[in-house]
Amino acid sequence: MLRKKGAFLMSLNKSFLLVLFFALFQNINSESAVSGKTVQASDSMVVTRHFLATEVGNTILQNGGNAIDASVAISFALSVVLPQAAPIGGGGFMVIHEANTNQNFTIDYRETAPARATRDMFITEGVINRELALESYLSSGTPGTVYGLFIAHQKFGKLPWRQLIEPSIMLAREGFVITETLGTTLSD
């Protein structure tokens, strides 16, 4: 059994035995405390840090999607309802085990340095300028999340891309009740 803090998706459908979506793993806070109840499933299970993202993942599976489809849809949903935990402006990687072929695949979509970045760009007079390296616009990377999710979908997904992102578009357009933590984050 997989035990990790944060969001994870475990699917036992025929195409995929296990998906570890490390970009979603985050520390659990008081708003996502575990109830202590045991839950079992014979076909598939979706668990995330936010119930709306969990609903999105379950709906994708119920509509014939596989674990990758659900992971992609969940990632976009989390970037709407819990943007500080799973932003599309970030990056990550995905490890996939394909049960039919018994092969493992890794998709690395971590942020990359901008094209004009140089090795010494944060060094001033021979010393690392921490403020420049950590708190300036120069310290940002080129996001990889959307590209990585797209590659995973192209290689392993079943459902149309639009069907995977539509729930997140609806959440963003129609709105949702935010948690106290998100409210605090947005107000800072």
PLM feature segments, named:
Residues 12, 26-28, 56-57:
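Intrinsic-disorder/low-complexity regions
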Residues 2-17:
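Bacterial N-terminal signal peptides that target proteins for export
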Residues 15-27:
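Bacterial N-terminal signal peptides
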Residues 31-55, 59, 67-188:
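Noncatalytic scaffold domains of N-terminal-nucleophile
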